[in-house]
Amino acid sequence: MVPLSEYATVDEDATLSEALDVLEKAQEQFDKTRYRHRAILVCEKKTGKVIGKISQLDVIRSLEPKYDLFMEEKAFPQTGMSHFGFSPKFMKNILDQYQLWYEPLHDICGKAGKQNVKDVMHKPTAGEYVKEDANLGEAVHQLIMGHHQSLLVTKKEDIVGILRLTDVFKEICIDRRKANQPSAGQK
């Protein structure tokens, strides 16, 4: 778990451009022995409480607002359209029909940077929170079942950190290595 105090955060009134600056700075300053941040937590201005998060995918998706026309979560509450496994031909048809990514990337990025993070952020669902005292198996189950890249860790009602899939994977690799080492009595 990465403590909340060590994670990239922005106020809800920040622009997407400001949020990306914070993420870049956090990546530069983060301990080089660990994985870099891949998301930004959005905090309520008055209370400082986490109200959302912005992943790298959220940022990229926000560059092309036309995705909202057919990937709206209201139409597909669990996953949007992203998990249906469409054919390459169908995907290309959508790209052309909605004229996605037709403008130069430089122009798209310039417009998107002015967006407010409240309009881009993902509001975590109940399945994206895990209690601080939950065992690793429970957290792994939530990550797998929800296809989540991270979970917000809570202590009572407060968010105290973020448990990232990359950290869980690293721990699994360490434990696998230990499990495959011969014990002291074996040779």
Label each PLM-derived region with a short phrase.
Residues 1-4, 14, 21, 53-56, ...:
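Non-catalytic interaction/Regulatory regions outside core domains
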Residues 26-28, 45, 103-106, 116, ...:
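Residue-level detector of functional hotspots within protein domains
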